[in-house]
Every structure is written in C-alpha cells, then in structure tokens.
A protein has these predicted regions:
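Nucleotide/pyrophosphate-binding catalytic subdomain
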Residues: 1-226, 318, 393-395, 410, ...
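Short phosphate-binding/catalytic loops that engage adenosine nucleotides
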Residues: 36, 92, 234, 298, ...
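Terminal amphipathic helices with adjacent charged low-complexity linkers/tails
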Residues: 42-50, 189, 238-257, 311-312, ...
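Short hydrophobic alpha-helical runs that function as membrane-insertion/retention elements
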Residues: 178-182, 236-238, 301, 381-382
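Acidic/polar loop patches that form or flank catalytic/metal-binding clefts of enzymes
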Residues: 222, 233-239
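Acidic-aromatic/histidine active-site loop/patch
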Residues: 229
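A conserved regulatory-domain signal marking ACT and ACT-like small-molecule sensing domains
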Residues: 247-429
C-alpha cells in the first residue's frame, strides 16, 4: 500500500506552456516515486481564463452566467488532459477528470458557486487502479429538479482562485496527508517582495492569520480554501513550481499566542469607495441601502457613518472595484427616493493591512501603524479592524510607500525569536 495520499494543485503560471506542463508532470512523477498516491488539481493554462472571458465579452456586454460557466470550465479541462498526456509520455499511468466526473457538487450560483459535497468514488477507483488522477479545478456541477420532476445538472465555477478550493476540498474528503499548492512564489512572505526587498518568507503561519491575509488581498491562497483547510484540519503547503525550495506551511500554529507580533502585511488594489452625502438620519435607511446590494451579490466591506447633524449624515463604504458600476446603478434610484444630496465614488484607492495574532494581546499596534503612515505623509481615509488585523484605506498611488513604511516600522525583516525558517505571505495585486 502507498505510504500516503497527497493532493497537489498547480496554478496557471505553472502550466503556461508545453514545457511547463512537462515540468509539472515530472514533479508529479517524482512524488509518486516516493510511494504516494497522487491527485493533482489544475487551473487553466496561463491567461486562458482571462482570454475566454474577453472573448465572451466581445460577443456580448453581459454574457449569460450559465453559458459563461460552461465556457470558462473548458480552460481547466484543457490543462487536465494535457497534464495527463504528459504523464503518459513519461510512463506514468494517469487519467483526467472534470469536476463533475470527480464527484464535486455545488450550489447553483453561477460564477461564485460553493462546494456542497464531494463523492470521491471515481477518484478512489482510479487511484486503486494505480493511476495518478488529474482533476480540473475551479468547477463542479449543481443539481436541481426541473418542472417535470427530472434532475438537471449544470456546470458551475467557483470564482477566482477556485482551484485552491477544489484541492483543499478533495484533500479533506480523501483524508490526504497534505495538500500542496504550487505557485509562482516560494510561499507566504511578510510583504509583497515586489514592494519590499527585505520581505521575509515564513516557514509556518496559522490558519487564522492566513485567512485574514487572504481576505485583505494576499493572493497566494484563496480565502475559501483556507477556511476549508482550517475547518477540516488539512495541512497546506505553499511551494514554488519553479524551484525545489522550502515553502510555507499553513497549519495550526502552537506558538501563535506567544509570538505576539505582526506576522505580515497584505494589500489590495481591487477596492472602490462609495459615499452617500447627507443621508436622512432615521431608522431603516441603512437597510434600504445595503439590502439591494446584498441581493445583487455585492459584498460590502468597511462601513463608516459620520455623526449626524441636522437630521442627516454621511455614509461611506468600500466594495470590490469590479462591482462599482453595478452598485451605482442600484443606488442612484434609491438616492432619489430617499433624498441623498449626492452619491460620490472613488476608485483610486487601496487597502493596506497589518495582520498578526499578537495584535489582540498587546497595546500600541494601531498607534505604530498610524504613526508610520503619518511619517510617510500618507493620509488615512478609512480604518477597519478585527481581533488580529488593522486595515487602512489610502490613496492607491501611495500604496507601495505605505507597505515599505509599515514593513520597516514593525521590523518584519527580522526573524521570529521563537523560531522561523525561510518560507512566504503578502504577495497580492
């Protein structure tokens, strides 16, 4: 019997061309040679997803969500079959499976479906037959009863980063020893190394800290994947596809309470701010604003309401930049109905966050963060916090300077005194 089962996930940059696909096949073969059973989850090659989306938008400004999911899922189908062919070419038995063939079921929300369950019988049978199983990530199948009582199946996609979620969900359901996420960086860093030359790779980071970093813009891991790993106690390794070097382990960190420090910075350019000026200050108005946005699937982040004067107040909130136009269309008639004086927007902004379990255990973190930004002449427009995170909204053209100032202020280039090998966190936009 094989010693263990390993799930590996390869992102688009790892599969960008035929040479890289062959390199991925060799990496899979090396792991299999150690005696492990292998399931590999693959993203679409390179920029394939963006290219397919652009093609759809060249046909129509508003592609049907069902048809768009069917189209986008083909990118992962292509990768899975090519990786399987590459394995066959070097003598490794393999089979490619779509998300549906792999037993991944989802809810019916096209473009942002959530995994409802995994039935891995087909995967298990192929593993028992001695094959490496290559699964198309980012997708699944929803099932619903039609009007005539028949069950209909529809292809769904999981949203950006959905292949991470596929990999962790399969690792949890199959009882994998670990889930390896191969990407174009070595792991999780204290900040984006493109901004900070001294950014340091982390050897280990806890689920909670990683989840906050992912939520605030660190794009190495998708947030839902981290959540699934945390809930199911899946050990996740973030590794480079292009070099054999130690990565970052995402797992329960027994020293998290003792570290008492900021672990990393995250940033996000995909932000826009909406301000409703002189909103009537009465019960029910906030609901009238935010309920239609929620119904449209728009996620609102930071919310700030000024102290009311003269029966009116200003209400500001942030959302994903891609949702700004839709939000304006929804809010403009509401503004006329409720009597706002003005609706303003700003998309030239960004978020920068400090993250660490130590924030809840010691005073002074907020003061140091705000002081570092002030010393760099960076104005803070909005602030939000959680138990382990402080986020500031700033002008986008000051983002890189902010990241460098905060990295220096919290001395993140220094190794952790409790023990920290080299590893990787804050890469984002």
């Amino acid at each position: 019997m094989p010693a263990s089962l390993v799930v590996q996930k390869f992102g688009g940059s790892s599969l960008a061309d035929a040479d890289r696909i062959r390199s991925v096949a060799r990496r899979i073969a090396r792991e299999r040679a150690k005696g492990a059973e292998l399931v590999a989850v693959v993203s679409a090659m390179g920029d394939t997803t963006d290219e397919l989306l652009a093609l759809a938008e060249a046909i129509t400004d508003e592609p049907d969500s069902r048809e768009l999911d069917v189209l986008l899922a083909t990118g992962e189908h292509q990768s899975a079959t090519l990786v399987s062919m590459a394995l066959h070419a070097i003598g490794v038995p393999a089979i490619s499976l779509t998300g549906a063939q792999a037993g991944i079921t989802t809810d019916g929300r096209h473009g942002r479906a959530r995994i409802a369950g995994v039935e891995p019988r087909r995967i298990r049978a192929e593993l028992d037959a001695g094959k490496v199983v290559i699964v198309a990530g980012f997708q699944g199948v929803s099932q619903a009863a039609s009007q005539d009582g028949e069950t209909t199946s529809e292809t769904t996609t999981l949203g950006r980063g959905g292949s991470d979620t596929t990999a962790v969900a399969l690792a949890a359901r199959l009882g994998a020893a670990r889930c390896q996420i191969f990407t174009d960086v070595r792991g999780i860093y204290t900040a984006d190394p493109r901004f900070v030359a001294g950014a340091r790779q982390l050897s280990v980071i806890g689920y909670e800290e990683m989840l906050e970093l992912a939520h605030q813009g660190a794009q190495v891991m998708q947030t839902r994947a981290v959540e699934l790993g945390w809930v199911n106690d899946v050990i996740i390794e973030v590794l480079s596809s292009f070099e054999d070097a130690p990565g970052t382990l995402i797992a329960e960190d027994p020293l998290v309470e003792q570290r008492n420090k900021v672990r990393g910075l995250a940033h996000d350019r995909n932000v826009a701010k909406v301000t409703l000026v002189e909103v009537p200050d009465r019960p029910g108005v906030a609901r009238s604003v935010f309920e239609p946005l929620a119904d449209a699937g728009i996620i609102v982040d930071t919310i700030v309401q000024n102290v009311g004067h003269g029966g009116a107040t200003d209400l500001s909130f942030t959302l994903a930049r891609a949702d700004l136009a839709k939000a304006k269309r929804i809010l403009e008639p509401i503004a006329r109905e409720l009597g706002f004086r003005e609706l303003t927007t700003d998309s030239a902004i960004a978020k920068v966050s400090i993250v660490g379990a130590g924030i809840q255990n010691a005073p002074g973190y907020a003061a140091r963060m705000f002081g570092a930004l002030a010393d760099a002449a960076i104005n803070i427009e909005m602030i939000s916090t959680s138990e382990i995170r402080i986020t500031c909204l700033i002008a986008e053209d000051q983002l890189e300077a902010a990241v460098r100032a905060l990295h220096a202020a919290f001395e993140l280039e220094r190794p952790d005194e409790l023990g920290e090998g080299t590893g990787a966190v804050g890469a984002a936009s």
